[in-house]
Amino acid sequence: MLICLTAIGGAQASSYIENGQAGDPASWRSSEFNAEWGLGAIHADQAYAAGYTGKGIKLGIFDQPVYAKHPEFAGENKVINLVTEGIREYTDPYIPVKKGDAFRYDGTPSVDSDGTLGSHGTHVGGIAAGSRDGGAMHGVAFNAQIISAENGDPGPEDGIILGNDGAVYKAGWDALVASGARIINNSWGIGITEKFDEGGYDPAYPHFTVNDAQKQFDQIKQILGTKPGGAYQGAIDAARSGVVTIFAAGNDGNLNNPDAMAGLAYFVPEIAPNWLSVASLQDPTNTGDYSISTFSSRCGYTASFCVSAPGTRVYSSVIEGTSLENLTTGYAKYSGTSMAAPHVAGSVAVLMERFPYLSGAQVAEVLKTTATDMGAPGIDALYGWGMINLGKAINGPGMLVTEQDIPEEFLVNGAYGPTQFVVDLPGVGAVLDKGKPTERVCSDVLCGLDFWSNDISGHGGLTKQGIGTLVLTGNNTYAGPTLVNQGRLAINGSVTSDVSVQNGGIVGGSGTVGSLTARRGGTVAPGNSIGTLNVAGNVSFEPGSRYAVEVGPNGQSDRIQSSGSATIGGGEVAVTLENSSNLLTQSEVRSLLGQQYNILTAQQGVSGQFDAVAPNYLFLGTGLSYQPNGVTLSVGRNGTSFASVAQTANERAVAAAADALAAGNPVYESILNSGTAGEARQAFRQLSGQIHADIASALVNDSRYLREALNGRLRQAEGLASSSAIKADEDGAWAQLLGAWDHASGDANATGYQAST
């Protein structure tokens, strides 16, 4: 544990008005911000100005208890102190406890081996997530919730493996994981023996190496899975569960490597993606520049999962006194990698809010790959990846890491996860980590749409999953493939890798890609509305793929522009109006009549054709023409003639005559806009004149009914059909109802008709 250099009291403001403004980092640099120099060093103000403060994130502190009643943690449930209990496994020579004793921790401050109340956890908690409320200082993730579990460790760290009581630590690990904490900060370790401490900074003396750490791990390995090994098994289990597990590198000087606790992921490589070790940096006001603290252990063999953060003279919350009766609260400056680690923990919390859809391992990769390089170029033995930089990290990863990106000196086989960085934007409202203690609803709009602006390098590849949209605006040189499996990937910057759109995926944007392949079910939709997607290499459309083209009335359209060749093996071209997701309506097609659009150009030539183009209506639609180096889309008359939908010779004659009329003729335009063949045939009948002959025929035919009625009445007068005699001196009346239904069949020459009287 570390030494308090100065203690300064402070009180929280009774009411607080936030003066920090969105988009203005300088507005966040209040006196409260400036009191903790580490915040400015890691560019936390840029994260705050972008709207990210760790809100909604549970941040675990495994240490001496964080004193929840300290005014730095004012507010409901700002600090949750977990209760752990059990039977001890170790007799500690520094405090009066022995193996077999019962223990119970509930957040009540405990007494250190020097007789004073343990303030270490409270100081660490303030750095990680102290509240921003106008008080003396605030932490990195000031809106995060602290979950505190006590490790019962009064110090010192003496290199004894069993000294970290297996029962006490395992209870704490299990409680923290069960609480839903996504991050666990550990500002403690095993330590190294006096053999190495005696050497100080003299290179002539022995110093702690990876081989010495291996000897420690050999002892640890023997007790994994047992009660005495709970401190180590618990750490492994936490990291395996997906919790980002952070360890201070140690305070043994720049010539010593971290102990096997901070370096546990080196020996258990599968947990390395969720593991971070942390070296300490000095306050530049004392040194003129950021550099490793003189007391800090180097990153050493942990370099590929190690970062550096402020750890010298860090101002944060403390408690003082020798008992609860004389406990007081205040603030003090402490130094140590114990102070560096919570800067990292708070930063991870901020990034978890920033990237709610990323796993803990992915957030850790973002933090590592955006660190400011220090010391020797790239990953080095002193600083690891370098000093964490929240201002850059909020813009996405800086590298997609595989083993090929790690210097051989620091390479740990099997420690870097999959070669594809899978970005799953599941959509707003999706449930994440279902069934785990960290289960949560992704309620942020970022789960549906996010922008990454960093330039991304590395040997890994990018896989887009989920229904949401990811937009890349940087100049990306990562070497692995870009796979769009679901949702939309918009490339507005550049990607030098090969881009492949799978079934259910959409690729778009107005940037440049290395090559482009659209597979069955995949869609290419250039632009962000209308725009051009540039391809440095070749383009390929496979059978069943789709090319979605937006067009505008001004002659502009989406376009693919390739410096290589274009191979079209089928698929469909679907045409929509600008800013619409639906195919062109008939009226929209009519409004674009005569327009032509260059939708694909390839300097090395175009081969093959698309299977279809949509939409197509009765007489209007879209069509494609192919040139040696391009494909042109035309909007206008399709190949369906007016006469082809006519049914009779009369209709065909009229249809052919109408088809020969010039565009703009009202008869031609009326037929052109017919929605169905039936509508067109009705127009042909009206124009053919057949109705006049049909009326004459019907009138002649129907006239017989009146004639027959009169003749029938005359026959009555002759007595031929009268049922009763009518006297000469009587009046009479005669009435008869007439009705008829006529039908005339048509033939190839003329249509039939129906009539009723």
Q: Which functions belong to the PLM regions below?
A:
Residues 16, 53-55, 116-119, 131-134, ...:
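Substrate-binding/access-modulating region of protease and related hydrolase catalytic domains
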Residues 16-25, 35, 45-165, 179-182, ...:
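Subtilisin-like serine protease catalytic core
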Residues 36, 43, 174, 183-185, ...:
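C-terminal subdomain of the subtilisin-like protease fold in secreted/lumenal serine endopeptidases
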Residues 63, 84-100, 264-349, 353:
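Extracellular S/T/G-rich loop segment that most often corresponds to the catalytic His/Ser-adjacent loop
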Residues 125-128, 149-154, 311-383:
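Hydrolase catalytic cores
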Residues 330, 337, 342-343, 350, ...:
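Extracellular repeat-rich scaffold modules on cell surfaces
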Residues 506-595:
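Extracellular beta-strand/loop-rich repeat segments of large surface/secreted proteins
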Residues 665-757:
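Outer membrane beta-barrel translocator domains of Type V secretion systems
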